[in-house]
């Protein structure tokens, strides 16, 4: 999923910007740190999560028990209140801040997350956002 694909998915969702934010690989793509991601992960407010549950969208508890994780189709997951730091607009799209994204990746601790942290750090050292 490239930047255009992500923007199209978000357009199709048609959610108010205050209800959600892009995290994980999608945020990496929107910041220009990667050209594509396998899927789109979003954070959302409890109010949006309640709307999704009422609409019958499949969900399960998040691993840490802090909220719900919804599955929209084959390539979009929505995590209730999954946010570190703050949300900032990137080309008009609500996206987790780079510092928040870095911390989120550090907490996940997978090899691909360590590679992403290196990309974020290099970008910040070059004076990015």
Regions found by a protein language model. Give the residues of each.
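Compositionally biased terminal segments of proteins
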Residues: 1-129
